[in-house]
From Swiss-Prot:
Testis (at protein level). Detected in ovary. Expressed in both male and female germ cells. This is Testis-expressed protein 12. Coiled coil: none annotated. Residues 1-41 are annotated as: Disordered. PANTHER family: TESTIS-EXPRESSED PROTEIN 12 (PTHR37349:SF1). Keywords: Chromosome, Meiosis. The gene is Tex12. Residues 7-21 have a biased composition (Basic and acidic residues). One of its GO terms (biological process) is meiotic DNA repair synthesis. The keyword Membrane does not apply. It comes from Mus musculus (Mouse). It is found in: Chromosome.
Length: 123
């Protein structure tokens, strides 16, 4: 009783129409003409499924390539921004070095000046 009951796969997540699934014949015996028509029908169904699969794969490939190129563009833009930040920081370091050197020279000048003033006051 259970052997005659066929369980059909869950087709809720299937994108294809149910008619693409091979149908089980209820008749116990099929003529040779019926068998050749059936195998021709199955072959054309397989060809259709193969074409549909190739189209789906092609579409997915295009979509993946689009996402990868978008990702590469974003990375390129971020790299350009990072490079501009590095250039700006380099400029700030150079400016800080110039100011530091100026302040060191100024301190030495003031030190010499105070030495002269101190020597003058001691005389």
């Amino acid at each position: 009783m259970m052997a005659n009951h066929l369980v059909k796969p869950d087709s809720r997540n299937c994108k294809r129409a149910r008619e693409l699934e091979p149908q089980v014949s209820d008749s116990p015996q099929v003529s040779s003409l019926g068998k050749s028509e059936s195998s021709l029908s199955e072959a054309s169904g397989l060809f259709y499924k193969e074409e549909a699969l190739e189209k789906d794969l092609s579409d997915m490939s295009k979509e993946i390539n689009l996402m990868l190129s978008t990702y590469a563009k974003i990375l390129s833009e971020r790299a350009a921004v990072d490079a501009s930040y590095i250039d700006e920081i380099d400029g700030l370091f150079k400016e800080a070095n110039i100011i530091e050197n100026f302040l060191v020279q100024k301190r030495e000048f003031l030190k010499q000046r105070f030495t002269v003033i101190t020597n003058t006051l001691h005389k």
